[in-house]
């Protein structure tokens, strides 16, 4: 893929040259259709964002984003009519993936038939997905060929309102427990109101074991401040507290991919952060958009670049966690 870079950073959109301004100058060829279609209508202070803008974003961010997706089955959220029209979630691409694109076939939960998920292993694949009007990519917590064993643990902090101070405090509490166990904690905005805390795993445990491990950590965090935190799945029972959700730690479940755009006004991005950025005045989990993130990457790089060099085997940590909870 031909992307102009300065200092190792993606700088210049790929498609803004040629007859109609959008020519797919890459091998394999990716045909770009309807680049002027508005996917994000103008709203308040947000200007309209086109399909071409979305494609350009994913092309620019691809060198950073692809390593986080490589080997993971994906689910795509598509909005052919834009975000003000109903979109749909697609997992099975058995009949529509181009020949050159990677894929993984997994058995359906029912045991009847299979699902063919796209797998992003190259920059062109992100451009192809964006051209399918895919705004948001969600990825599994495991990679092939070891789909039964997660390589990351995830805590999804889901607030009841816009009080970010409570979300931030909860995120730091999760990180404190994770780090006390000897693991490394990473943080990402969701592009909405919450945060994801992620800890890389060594792939020695199945999903049930990992989820129970995460559930125990979440229990410690909630017990430390039950007034503001909860494990209650039902929204009606949360009483305005932050839900510390560990249910994504399951086979076939997904989390919003790092650097994915969300289908919300202004095109906010699910953005990996440095921990000190949580304390920046005015910080909002939806505060970074597809307009801002490529420039930010040139200035700060990828906070998750070393994540999988910090992976920990889970087995030795289970006794340590039991002692923390004693």
Report residues per predicted region:
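Catalytic palm subdomain of template-directed nucleic-acid polymerases
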Residues: 198-210
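Short polybasic linear motifs
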Residues: 13-16
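Short beta-strand
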Residues: 77-79, 185-191, 232-236
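C-terminal accessory nucleic-acid interaction domains of nucleic acid-metabolism proteins
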Residues: 21-56, 63-66, 70-71, 110-111, ...
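Basic, low-complexity intrinsically disordered segments
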Residues: 83-135, 140-141, 146
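Active-site palm subdomain of RNA-directed nucleic acid polymerases
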Residues: 175-189
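Short, conserved phosphate-binding/catalytic loop or strand-edge motifs used
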Residues: 189-199
């Amino acid at each position: 893929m031909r992307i102009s870079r300065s200092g190792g950073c993606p700088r210049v959109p790929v498609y803004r040259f040629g007859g109609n301004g959008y020519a797919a100058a890459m091998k394999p060829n990716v045909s770009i259709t309807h680049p002027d279609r508005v996917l994000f209508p103008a709203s308040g202070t947000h200007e309209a964002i086109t399909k071409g803008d979305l494609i350009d974003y994913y092309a620019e961010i691809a060198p950073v984003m692809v390593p986080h997706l490589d080997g993971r089955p994906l689910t795509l959220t598509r909005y052919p009519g834009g975000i003000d029209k109903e979109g749909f979630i697609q997992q099975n691409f058995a009949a529509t993936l181009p020949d050159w694109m990677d894929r993984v076939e997994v058995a359906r939960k029912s045991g009847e038939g299979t699902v063919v998920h796209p797998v992003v292993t190259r920059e062109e694949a992100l451009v192809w997905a964006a051209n399918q009007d895919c705004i948001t990519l969600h990825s599994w917590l495991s990679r092939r060929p070891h789909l039964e064993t997660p390589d990351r643990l995830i805590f999804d902090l889901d607030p009841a309102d816009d009080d970010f101070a409570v979300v931030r405090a909860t995120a730091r509490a999760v990180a404190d427990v994770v780090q006390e166990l000897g693991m490394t904690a990473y943080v990402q905005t969701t592009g909405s109101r919450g945060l994801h805390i992620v800890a890389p795993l060594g792939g020695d445990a199945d999903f049930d074991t990992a989820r129970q491990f995460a559930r125990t950590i979440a229990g410690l965090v909630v017990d430390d401040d039950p007034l503001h935190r909860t494990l209650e799945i039902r929204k009606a029972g949360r009483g305005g507290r932050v839900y510390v959700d560990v249910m994504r730690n399951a086979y076939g479940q997904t989390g919003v991919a790092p650097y994915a755009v969300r289908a919300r006004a202004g095109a906010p991005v699910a953005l990996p952060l440095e921990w000190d950025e949580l304390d920046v005045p005015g910080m909002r989990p939806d505060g970074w958009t597809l307009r801002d993130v490529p420039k930010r990457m040139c200035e700060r790089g990828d906070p998750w670049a070393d994540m999988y060099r910090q992976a920990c085997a889970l087995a030795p940590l289970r006794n340590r966690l039991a002692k923390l909870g004693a």
